[in-house]
């Protein structure tokens, strides 16, 4: 139904208008009594081979929702009901900001890709805190992707402010230093700058742990796919030196190699199918560089169970999707979940953790 009816209708709309319509509809469904439970019956059945415990939380599926789709955390119950094993909200900044001028989101259907230059549009950390506080009992871990406001000169203070505001509603923090749409942000990936920033964030999580006596959420960092190999290695090492607890590989790319659609010249970060191979190779690099010391989360061009499995075998403990959800529809997480179980069975692997890094 999605491909035949809903997708053609949505693709007649401006990409951002369709985005808002979809998220608002899911937010409404999240508030309907009984709807999430009913939708959950349509998702893939639980599979103990895919269940993992990471950072003290249970992940019933390794397939999560990447940041950017539900920036303000308004539809977490709906995304959980669709079968995602975790949901990453944001990117959130301390203060609300409108982001860049529209149009700023573009579909490239022949390339199964998106280009965005959103610019961290969001309602701010206080609003997100209120939204997540109202969730009640959660069925999946909720990660919070944090960034800096566009006009902030001292970046660390914004990341620390997000931790202070959201500490008790986040199951994990993701430090976003790799969006190409905030001036100067990617410079924070340089080894020394990244290590200093992550130390500031980790110091704040420790301070909050002591203040609240609540277990500190893990801190992960999200890296870009456009770094030179030596710079990527230095960034990974800087993150490890700081004590980060996970890596997300990778964010959107500035590359336009192989694109055919007219929108290929639009400024912004490219996501979707063109990143499949590149991001998988970077997951493998990250796994080798860390020697499996911290979990790696693979994201970029995952359209099927085969794509997800390739990233897992390259070294990803978890994977995330976003652009493919736009093209494949709400049944995608359940299809990937079922397919991963079949692939493990095919390869005679008893649990997904035993597949992590098998090809690294």
Curated annotation (Swiss-Prot):
One Gene Ontology BP term is: 'de novo' pyrimidine nucleobase biosynthetic process
InterPro entries, from UniProt? Aldolase_TIM, DHO_dehydrogenase, Dihydroorotate_DH_2, Dihydroorotate_DH_cat, Dihydroorotate_DH_CS
- Catalyzed reactions per annotation: (S)-dihydroorotate + a quinone = orotate + a quinol
E.C. no: 1.3.5.2
Where is substrate bound in this sequence?
Answer: 71, 116-120, 176, 181, 251-252
Q: What topology does the record note for this protein and the membrane? A: Peripheral membrane protein
Q: Name one GO molecular function term.
A: dihydroorotate dehydrogenase (quinone) activity
Q: Name one GO cellular component term.
A: plasma membrane
Class of this enzyme: oxidoreductase
Q: Classify the main location.
A: membrane
Q: How and how many cofactors are bound, per the record note?
A: Binds 1 FMN per subunit.
Q: Where in the cell is it found?
A: Cell membrane
What does this protein need as cofactor?
A: FMN
Q: Looking at the keywords, is Ribonucleoprotein present?
A: no
**Residues engaged in binding FMN:** 67-71, 91, 145, 176, 222, 250, 272, 301, 322-323
Stored PROSITE patterns: DHODEHASE_1 (PS00911), DHODEHASE_2 (PS00912)
What's the domain of life for this entry?
Answer: Bacteria
The record lists its disulfide bonds as none
Active site, UniProt feature: 179
Q: Name one Pfam family in it.
A: DHO_dh
**What subunit structure does UniProt give?**
Monomer.
Q: What PANTHER family does the record tag this protein with?
A: DIHYDROOROTATE DEHYDROGENASE (QUINONE), MITOCHONDRIAL, DIHYDROOROTATE DEHYDROGENASE (QUINONE), MITOCHONDRIAL-RELATED
The record's comment on protein family reads: Belongs to the dihydroorotate dehydrogenase family. Type 2 subfamily.
What this chain does, per the entry, is described as: Catalyzes the conversion of dihydroorotate to orotate with quinone as electron acceptor.
Full protein name: Dihydroorotate dehydrogenase (quinone)
